[in-house]
């Protein structure tokens, strides 16, 4: 079952990985090497020092999922049609599979947006579960534009260059792309700095007042070696109400080699383990990680239910390799 096209976070920003485990784990290690020193002839070679570090964190991957019922009344109505609607029951169960998959992927997409927006994975009394994992994103990686970009006198070019220099100063790779909303992007068309850069103006009085089109904005960005922009507009339904996965006021600089930066981790569910030990139905043990759909029956009241289950969450390995800037 394919993911929704708008779900970029779990598809390509936080690449999905399935593990035969129930814990997430991150490691950070490295070393510093000082330069060697010159010496006079016949003088002793100086001793150097070894500087290295390794830190690790781990925690349990939380379970998530849902059930859908085929009620007692629905079963009676299907039976009342003398079995001619048996295919409808089968179709209903298969439709449930798609609903479960979309619901779980939607929740993980929302979780990835939560981690991107504030650097934390948080659950607050969600089905009775409260949880917080702080990935310790440095405050320097969560800047605010000096002047909101909705103000034509702001300077988005200088802001973005400053944020890219911040990444370069700490040795992080140059960002590969920008994720933002169409709303945040729209203000670039009327921005004085962008128009002056496109027309080569040295004075505001000589800058044409026409709005820039997307091609002209891209010319400016190319001239300043700024990364390409990808629009993000995904919404999910939470308790019957639509919710944006990411706020519209964010400008996110995303690094390359993203599997080293952050991932959407799926672990092994109890349902997957049961099926891997069973005979009818049965799955091989290598297929146990990931999203599992099962069916069950209860006799009082008589109900058939389908269940979607997963164990997973977004995990950030390198919390200082990206920028999440508030620009509006």
Segments predicted by a language model, with ranges:
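N-terminal alpha-helical "arm" segments
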Residues: 1-22, 315-328
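Short alpha-helical segments and helix-capping/turn motifs at coil-helix boundaries
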Residues: 6-10, 161-165, 290-292
């Amino acid at each position: 079952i394919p993911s929704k096209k708008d779900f970029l976070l779990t598809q390509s920003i936080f690449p999905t990985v399935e593990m035969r485990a129930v814990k997430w784990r991150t490691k950070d290690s490295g070393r510093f090497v000082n330069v060697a020193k010159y010496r006079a002839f016949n003088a002793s070679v100086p001793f150097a020092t070894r500087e290295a570090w390794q830190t690790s964190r781990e925690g349990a991957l939380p379970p998530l999922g849902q059930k859908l019922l085929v009620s007692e009344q629905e079963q009676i109505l299907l039976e009342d049609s003398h079995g001619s609607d048996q295919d409808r029951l089968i179709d209903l169960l298969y439709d449930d599979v798609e609903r479960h998959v979309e619901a779980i992927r939607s929740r993980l997409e929302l979780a990835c947006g939560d981690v991107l927006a504030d650097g934390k994975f948080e659950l607050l009394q969600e089905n009775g579960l409260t949880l917080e994992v702080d990935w310790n994103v440095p405050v320097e990686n969560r800047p605010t534009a000096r002047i909101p970009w909705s103000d034509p006198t702001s300077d988005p070019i200088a802001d973005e260059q400053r944020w890219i220099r911040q990444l370069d100063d700490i040795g992080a790779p140059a960002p590969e792309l920008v994720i933002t909303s169409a709303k945040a992007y729209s203000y670039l068309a009327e921005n004085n700095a962008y128009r002056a850069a496109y027309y080569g103006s040295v004075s505001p009085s000589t800058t044409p007042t026409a709005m820039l089109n997307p091609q002209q904005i891209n010319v400016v960005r190319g001239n300043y070696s700024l990364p390409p922009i990808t629009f993000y507009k995904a919404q999910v339904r939470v308790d019957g109400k639509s919710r944006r996965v990411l706020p519209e006021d964010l400008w996110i600089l995303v690094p390359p080699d993203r599997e080293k930066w952050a991932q959407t981790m799926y672990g092994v569910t109890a349902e997957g383990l049961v099926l891997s030990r069973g005979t009818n139905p049965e799955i091989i043990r290598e297929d146990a990680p990931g999203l599992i759909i099962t069916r069950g029956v209860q006799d009082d009241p008589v109900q058939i239910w389908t269940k979607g289950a997963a164990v997973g969450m977004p995990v950030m390995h390198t919390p200082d390799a990206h920028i999440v800037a508030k620009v509006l």
